[in-house]
A protein has these predicted regions:
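Short beta-strand-to-loop elements that line the ligand-binding cleft
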Residues: 72-79, 98, 246-254, 290-291
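Alpha-to-beta junction loops
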Residues: 90-98, 112-113, 192-194, 264-270
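Oxyanion-binding "anion nests"
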Residues: 254-275
Length: 321
């Protein structure tokens, strides 16, 4: 193993923010070796990226700059809705958006993404089959494997998958039993009114609400990840009514915010990232991660190249990194 590989692995192992994307002790990045796309003029380029604070980190950008030779790097932490607003408003401040897959249509349909050739990614050969082999349960376009490609020939990518995980429910075992917590409906249970939490991103919240509504007998949506317009309208009514009734202590959007709200006891049940639950437990506070009867919510995040960037090679190198 090379020194570069050791440094990369050490960086990921000890980065608390990046660990917010890991399952247990596994590394969240899909590639386990250090192979970076190099370009002769990379030193003349810069990388300006935007995304969640758990992927956009100075120590990661610093390491990328050192190993790639790119001239400059800068990162802006923002929620997905805020980042989308900036990019669709025509901002020229970014070369790359570390986007979550469900928001890909927003930049594809508005021509704000420039596809990345798969052949330019040395690490593509190591990608997990999660992103290359479709499941027979749904049509390919309803799965991540059918959404990341810009062409039917599968030669260019609208998003290069970098991290992925499955989210569940974080809860205080001193307040809820495992049986109570092991359903998405727990977040909306009046018993925990004023002490539950929900992610502020509507594309996340809606899917979780629909799973809860199915369990509560309020809907019968076959694929909560791809609801119809009518099903979305019903979920919106449900969420608005719950918010007006004071169900939620907070609509959280950041890792640190989530940890603080759970550790303080202000939120006793919420949708949560597993490492946030681990961070609460590390403080000596009671916190567990549920196994929802409806299943977990899967997601994938990765770099997308913003159309019109003059730093294309830097974005490709970062995606490969």
């Amino acid at each position: 193993m090379s020194k570069m590989e050791m440094n990369r692995r050490s960086l990921l192992k000890h980065s608390a923010g990046v660990m917010a994307l890991a399952i247990g002790g596994g590394t969240p990045f899909l590639s386990s070796r250090a192979a970076y796309a190099q370009a002769a003029n990379l030193a003349k380029e810069q990388l300006r990226t935007i995304g969640l604070s758990v992927t956009v980190q100075e120590r990661i950008l610093d390491d990328f700059r050192k190993v790639s030779g790119v001239g400059q790097t800068s990162g802006t932490a923002a929620t997905f809705p805020d980042a989308q607003t900036k990019i669709l408003s025509g901002s020229k401040d970014y070369d790359c958006w570390e986007i979550i897959a469900e928001r890909l249509p927003s930049i594809v349909m508005t021509n704000n993404v420039e596809p990345i050739p798969a052949a330019s990614l040395k690490n593509w050969a190591n990608i997990r089959d999660t992103f290359t082999t479709p499941s027979g349960k749904w049509q390919p376009k309803q799965q991540i494997v059918g959404q990341i490609w810009a062409d039917d020939a599968k030669t260019t990518l609208n998003m290069v998958p970098a991290v992925y995980n499955y989210d569940s429910i974080g809860y205080n075992p001193d307040v809820l039993s495992a049986e109570e917590a092991n359903t998405w409906a727990a977040i909306f249970d009046p018993k925990f009114k004023g002490k539950s939490g929900l992610n502020t991103d509507p594309l996340i919240a809606f899917g979780q609400a629909i799973m809860a509504m199915n369990t509560l007998g309020l809907s019968n949506v076959k694929n909560p990840a791809n609801p119809t317009t009518a099903e979305i309208d019903e979920a919106a009514k449900f969420l608005v009514s719950k918010k007006k009734d004071g169900q939620f202590r907070a609509l959280w959007g950041d890792f640190g915010e989530l940890v603080n709200l759970m550790a303080s006891g202000e939120m006793v049940v919420c949708d949560a990232w597993q490492p946030a639950v681990m961070a609460v437990k590390a403080q000596g506070k009671a916190c567990k991660y549920a196994v929802p009867q409806e299943g977990c919510r899967g997601w994938a995040i990765g770099p997308s190249m913003i159309a019109g960037t003059s730093n294309k090679e830097a974005v490709i190198a970062y995606a490969d990194y």
